[in-house]
């Protein structure tokens, strides 16, 4: 018995406090259930049939008369349209009473006891209760519950819409530390200083330093901005609130501003603390934007956020972290010191950064002895941290699919090709003619890149459909490129036209098709940028002539006018055409002079389907290629009516590692 009491006492001591919001909802349900029960009892109490025997049997009127004639009826109660009573065996009955003037005489002749009931009338109290009091009590009760719920939510909107959706993260929830972050050392050091300030404020305050009120993480997608915030949550040792910029604005007016107020009220109660707003551009966009009324719900939310961050009331001990990949669309008032004191740039990693990132992601991956991490890092310029993590994951999945116990270098190469060029689509079956046309197209791109100085080295060329392309030529820079000169841009212009010109030289002028549309788009965009943005036209000089391409929602394009005259626009078009025709002429000259090499490379692609840069050079030189396993060729017609004309993947911007051609 003592043991049982001790066990129960221990359980009582170990109970965690219940959620007050759950208790409030339980109380609301109990009150509502009580109101419904009271209404049911009241209706039952005032029901005129409440005292009737529930074991009553309904009988036909003819059977009732037979029972009367046979002395089988004990007593009868005559109502307005119903007869009820008891048979001689004390069983109750009821029946519908027609207008029968001889009924009373028949009952008297058989000595049946009977009585008559007055016509049913509804009392005043029943009318008052059912038609006025009960609905009034119901509405008053619902209104009372609604007001109570509004008060509990702090007046922040209907049924809690105004409550902040910021999530308080604990140290155990997805704990990430700065040790899990690599490749972005400068950004990490900037944020480590904030964590050090929270842990030891006197170290900085004794020299007059103040803790930064906010830090904005800026960088391309996938570079680790959110991961840095998670690391701060794991290292800071203070409450960490996380929310997305899209969580503020709802369809109800005033909800966003109310959520901002509620979020900062929670933060003040938990100060010192950190608030992290992911994708802040969803709420912090430039005010006065768009074609309609600028004073929309989003702007009210932004105004409240500005006031809370650095307004009349100081928020001591609250640090705001935010992340965005669109700093150009943010409101200037949001970016000023006092709100975001620091803008931490999170760039794509260089080769050393990629090496460290790969090492972090490979910790839990069993690697084969032939895996060279530095080679993988060198072959992935322009990759973000998310891209590198995806490569490691894809390589592990490929090895598991093949039944291997270790992930080899071949899986990493295949995973890199999949991430960069798309997955192989071997189910797309091409005819021999379509495959040959694709081979000459890709061979044209590859040959131009090998013979024109300024092109990135040829990494791989394939006629296997990948992604949305039926063939891909992949040129990979030898190192990270921070800028690109005019020689390289003109070489890329020639590279864009290598595929179509190769098809023309082999199949004639009638071979023009839609497959080079993406190549033409890339060349046109590059040439126009050279003329209007980069000042690479001698005739137009070092001026910016870019047309107004700002988005309407930024509020700029509506108020700006074109500062280019018609004559200048004509000159721009002429200069763009000159650059494009120059690239086309260079590509045609190279392919015409090396037509034999074009045939050899195309035949090698038809035979082997995929060639690396070195293997392509050996094929051009007429040397034997022995390192590739020959794949069987299929000449079944292309299914689904798809075109056999190769198309290249979308261009990913200058200076980045993007597949060229097809």
UniProtKB/Swiss-Prot annotation:
The keyword Cell membrane applies. Its EC number is 3.4.24.-. ATP binds at residues 219-226. The active site is at residue 442. Signal peptide: none annotated. Keywords: ATP-binding, Cell inner membrane, Cell membrane, Hydrolase, Membrane, Metal-binding, Metalloprotease, Nucleotide-binding, Protease, Transmembrane, Transmembrane helix, Zinc. It is an enzyme of class 3 (hydrolase). It comes from Zymomonas mobilis subsp. mobilis (strain NCIMB 11163 / B70). The lineage of its organism: Bacteria, Pseudomonadati, Pseudomonadota, Alphaproteobacteria, Sphingomonadales. The gene is ftsH. One of its GO terms (biological process) is proteolysis. GO terms for molecular function: ATP binding; ATP hydrolysis activity; ATP-dependent peptidase activity; metalloendopeptidase activity; zinc ion binding. Its main location: membrane. Binds 1 zinc ion per subunit. Residues 641-662 are annotated as: Disordered. Residues 49-126 are periplasmic. This is ATP-dependent zinc metalloprotease FtsH. Zn(2+) binds at residues 441, 445, 519. CDD domains: RecA-like_FtsH. Homohexamer. GO terms for cellular component: plasma membrane. Its cofactor is Zn(2+). PANTHER family: ATP-DEPENDENT ZINC METALLOPROTEASE YME1L1, METALLOPROTEASE M41 FTSH.
């Amino acid at each position: 018995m003592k043991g049982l009491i001790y066990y129960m006492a221990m359980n009582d001591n170990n109970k965690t406090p219940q959620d007050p919001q759950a208790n409030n909802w339980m109380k609301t349900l109990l009150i509502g259930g009580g109101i419904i029960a009271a209404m049911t009892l009241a209706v039952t109490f005032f029901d005129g049939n409440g005292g009737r025997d529930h074991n009553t049997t309904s009988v036909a009127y003819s059977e009732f008369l037979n029972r009367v004639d046979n002395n089988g009826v004990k007593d009868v109660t005559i109502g307005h349209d119903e007869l009820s009573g008891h048979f001689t065996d004390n069983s109750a009955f009821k029946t519908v009473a027609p207008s029968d003037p001889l009924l009373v005489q028949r009952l008297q002749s058989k000595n049946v006891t009977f009585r008559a009931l007055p016509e049913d009338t509804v009392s005043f109290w029943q009318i008052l209760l059912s038609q006025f009091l009960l609905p009034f009590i119901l509405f008053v009760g619902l209104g009372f519950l609604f007001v109570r719920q509004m008060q509990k939510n702090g007046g922040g909107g209907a049924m809690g819409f105004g409550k902040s959706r910021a999530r308080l993260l604990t140290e155990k929830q997805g704990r990430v530390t700065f040790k899990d972050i690599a490749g972005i050392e400068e950004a990490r050091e900037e944020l480590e200083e904030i964590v050090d300030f929270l842990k030891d404020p006197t170290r900085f305050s004794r020299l007059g330093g103040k803790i930064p009120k906010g830090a904005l993480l800026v960088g391309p997608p996938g570079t680790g901005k959110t991961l840095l915030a998670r690391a701060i949550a794991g290292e800071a040792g203070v409450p960490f609130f996380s929310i997305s910029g899209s969580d503020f604005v709802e369809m109800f007016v005033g909800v966003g501003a109310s959520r901002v107020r509620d979020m900062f009220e929670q933060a003040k109660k938990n100060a010192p603390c950190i608030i992290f707003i992911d994708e802040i551009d969803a709420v912090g966009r430039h005010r006065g934007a768009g074609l309609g009324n600028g004073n929309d719900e989003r702007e009210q939310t932004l105004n409240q956020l500005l006031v809370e961050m650095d307004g009349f009331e100081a928020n001591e001990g609250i640090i705001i972290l935010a992340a965005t990949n669109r700093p150009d669309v943010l409101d200037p008032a949001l970016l000023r010191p006092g709100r975001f004191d620091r803008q931490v740039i999170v760039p794509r990693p260089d080769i050393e950064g990629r090496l460290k990132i790969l090492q972090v992601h490979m910790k839990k991956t069993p690697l084969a002895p032939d895996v060279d991490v530095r080679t993988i890092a060198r072959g992935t310029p322009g990759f973000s941290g998310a891209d590198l993590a995806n490569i490691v994951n894809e390589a592990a999945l490929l090895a598991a699919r093949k039944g291997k116990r270790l992930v080899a270098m071949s899986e990493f190469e295949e995973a890199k090709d999949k991430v960069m060029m798309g997955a192989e689509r071997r189910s797309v079956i091409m005819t021999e003619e379509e495959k040959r046309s694709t081979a000459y197209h890709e061979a044209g791109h590859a040959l131009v890149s090998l013979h024109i100085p300024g092109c990135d080295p040829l990494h791989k060329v394939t006629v296997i459909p990948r992604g949305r392309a039926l063939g891909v030529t992949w040129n990979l820079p030898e190192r990270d490129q921070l800028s690109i000169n005019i020689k390289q841009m003109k070489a890329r212009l020639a590279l864009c036209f290598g595929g179509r010109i190769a098809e023309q030289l082999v199949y004639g002028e009638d071979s023009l098709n839609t497959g080079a549309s993406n190549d033409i788009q890339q060349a046109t965009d590059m040439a126009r940028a050279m003329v209007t943005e980069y000042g690479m036209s001698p005739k137009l000089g070092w001026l910016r002539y870019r047309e107004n391409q700002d988005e309407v929602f930024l509020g700029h394009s509506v108020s700006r006018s074109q500062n280019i005259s018609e004559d200048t626009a004509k000159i721009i078009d002429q200069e763009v055409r000159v650059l494009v025709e120059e690239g086309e002429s260079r590509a045609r000259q190279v392919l015409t002079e090396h037509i034999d090499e074009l045939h050899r490379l195309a035949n090698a692609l038809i035979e082997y389907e995929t060639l690396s840069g070195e293997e392509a050079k050996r094929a051009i030189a007429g040397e034997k290629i022995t390192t590739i396993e020959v794949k069987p060729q299929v000449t079944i017609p292309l299914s689904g009516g798809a075109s056999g004309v190769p198309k290249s993947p979308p261009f990913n911007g200058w200076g980045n590692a993007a597949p060229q051609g097809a």
